[in-house]
Amino acid sequence: MTTRKSHKARGAHFEVEVRDWFRSRKFSAERLARAGKNDEGDVVIHADFIGNIGILECKAPGAGNAIDLSGWTKEAQVEAGNYAKARGLPIESILPAVVIKARGKAIADAYLVFRLGDLFDD
C-alpha cells in the first residue's frame, strides 16, 4: 500500500471509529461523503452535540506529523459552513470541531477541539 493510500485508509478507519463511538452513546452520527472544495466534514452528529449539530473533522496524524490546530479548526469551520449552506440551515446551529486521534490509545482518549468563539457565538 502506498503512503498516500495508507494515510487515507488510516483516516477512514478513524472516521468510522469516531462515528461508532458517538453511536454507542446514543447520538445520531453519520459519516459524510467527500465533496472536494465543498466538503462538509467527516462525521455529523445530527442533534444535541453540545446543543448544536456537530460537524467533526477527524484527524489521525501519523508519527512525526505535526498537529495543526489552527488549520484544522479553520477547515472544520469552512466545512460546517458548507454543510449549513447545502441544507439551508443557520450557521449558528452548527458546531464545528476537530477530533484528533491519540496515537496508541483507545478512541475514548482522542482529543475534541473547538474554538471558544464557535462554542460561545463569537
Residue positions per predicted region:
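Catalytic phosphate/metal-binding cores of nucleic-acid and nucleotide-processing enzymes, i.e., regions
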Residues: 1-122
